[in-house]
């Protein structure tokens, strides 16, 4: 685990974004942890989050031309990542997002910001079922662009109904990488090192053993 990943997990816990206990997921599974990126809900939190996204993206080495934030949650994430890339990595790159509903006046259309062209890097919080990414792929392909990869905050490393995780299915179906700031493996490592949080380690390990990839 790299230093920025450890810092990200600590930050997520401090903000209440990453919590431990007993949570019922949409899938019906009872999880010993819960991740809600919507709680990065202040200016300072979003700025720090953007720096973590930028660090993961630069570290991945993925080549891309434009950042894309899927409506709605991906919009501030793509913006924050673009700002962090410019301010902390000297990379001034274009970014854009889509509207859920196309406008019929003004600039019109369903896309806002830079042109969606070339190699597109998708920025989102998590990939749960992969449905949202499949919708985004239609938008990208409709513009004659191609997806370079996906950048998310946390990889749960959890299989869906089959043997693969939603992330693995996206990587397989679209032949592109999915990069995360941190993964469940990193969370487990963090728990093992933290005296106060170590009590949650066995429950998360058991969940990983049952549903992990």
UniProtKB/Swiss-Prot annotation:
Q: Which residues bind 5-phospho-alpha-D-ribose 1-diphosphate?
A: 26, 72-73, 99-100, 103, 105, 124-132
Indicate yes or no for the key word Methyltransferase: no
Name of encoding gene: pyrE
One of the GO biological process terms: pyrimidine ribonucleoside biosynthetic process
GO CC field: cytoplasm
Pathway assigned to this chain's UniProt record: Pyrimidine metabolism; UMP biosynthesis via de novo pathway; UMP from orotate: step 1/2
Mark the transmembrane ranges. none
So which domain of life are we looking at?
Answer: Bacteria
Q: Needs which cofactor?
A: Mg(2+)
Tell me the protein's name: Orotate phosphoribosyltransferase
Reactions mediated catalytically: orotidine 5'-phosphate + diphosphate = orotate + 5-phospho-alpha-D-ribose 1-diphosphate
EC numbers, comma separated: 2.4.2.10
Q: Which Gene3D superfamilies does this UniProt record tie to the protein?
A: 3.40.50.2020
Q: Which UniProt keywords apply?
A: Glycosyltransferase, Magnesium, Pyrimidine biosynthesis, Transferase
**Which organism does this sequence originate in?**
Azotobacter vinelandii (strain DJ / ATCC BAA-1303)
């Amino acid at each position: 685990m790299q230093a920025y990943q450890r810092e990200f997990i600590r930050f997520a816990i401090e903000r209440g974004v990453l919590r431990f206990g007993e949570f019922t997921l949409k899938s019906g599974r009872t999880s010993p942890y819960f991740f809600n990126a919507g709680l990065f809900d202040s200016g300072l939190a979003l700025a720090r989050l953007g720096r973590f996204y930028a660090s993961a993206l630069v570290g991945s080495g993925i080549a891309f031309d434009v950042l894309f934030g899927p409506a709605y949650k991906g919009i501030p994430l793509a913006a924050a990542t673009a700002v962090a890339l410019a301010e902390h990595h000297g990379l001034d790159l274009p970014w854009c997002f889509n509207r859920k509903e196309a406008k019929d006046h003004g600039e019109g259309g369903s896309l806002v910001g830079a042109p969606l062209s070339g190699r597109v890097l998708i920025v989102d919080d998590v990939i749960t079922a992969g449905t949202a990414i499949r919708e985004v792929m239609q938008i990208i392909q409709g513009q004659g662009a191609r997806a370079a990869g996906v950048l998310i905050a946390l990889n749960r490393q959890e299989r869906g109904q089959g043997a693969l995780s939603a992330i693995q299915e996206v990587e397989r179906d679209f032949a592109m990488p999915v990069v995360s700031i941190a993964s469940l493996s990193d969370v487990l490592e963090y728990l093992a090192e933290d005296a106060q949080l170590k009590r949650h380690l066995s429950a998360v390990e058991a969940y990983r053993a049952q549903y992990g990839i």
